[in-house]
């Protein structure tokens, strides 16, 4: 079985910044098979059901063409998710906005809990710290990088990029 992941990667202008709101190319935020990019860590939900819900949310977010990519406007997705009260059933109500890879993950985590769990300030550089600050909710599962046996909601990344198993 192919592991499908969601991620946000590059704006329609081919850059990390300056993109228009919304997915202009259908490739800015997407779902696709797992790929190698030098991953060094895996963060796993301790609760399987929360992991599945985060994976579902990430997939719905990635398939919503109102969500595009631009690091300089990344918080606009977070603001839209706050507007719909982190209700996974209302993801289709999100208006045109942007995110980056880490904000997509943060929003998926918050949807898994149905509330603000993580702030919009998390980036790929500090995302692994949730295993320490929220150890009752998350754990490291770095051995999965070798086996490629990922669970729904697994966040796979390195400093600079992260993807989530959907």
Where in the sequence are the language-model features?
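Short, surface-exposed loop and linker segments with low hydrophobicity and enrichment for Pro/Ser/Thr
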Residues: 1, 148-149
């Amino acid at each position: 079985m192919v592991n499908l992941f969601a991620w946000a990667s590059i704006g329609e202008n081919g850059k990390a910044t300056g993109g228009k709101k919304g997915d202009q190319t259908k490739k800015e935020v997407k779902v696709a098979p797992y790929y190698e990019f030098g991953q060094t860590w895996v963060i796993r939900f301790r609760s399987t059901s929360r992991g599945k819900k985060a994976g579902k949310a990430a997939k719905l977010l990635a398939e919503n063409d109102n969500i595009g990519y631009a690091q300089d406007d990344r918080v606009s997705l977070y603001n839209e998710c706050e507007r719909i009260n982190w209700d996974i059933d209302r993801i289709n109500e999100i208006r045109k906005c942007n995110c980056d890879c880490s904000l997509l993950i943060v929003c998926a985590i918050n949807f898994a809990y149905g509330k603000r769990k993580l702030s919009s300030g998390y980036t790929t550089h500090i995302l692994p710290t949730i295993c320490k600050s929220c150890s009752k909710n998350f754990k490291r599962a770095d051995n999965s990088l070798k086996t490629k046996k990922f669970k729904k909601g697994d966040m796979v990344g390195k400093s600079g990029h992260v993807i989530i198993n959907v």
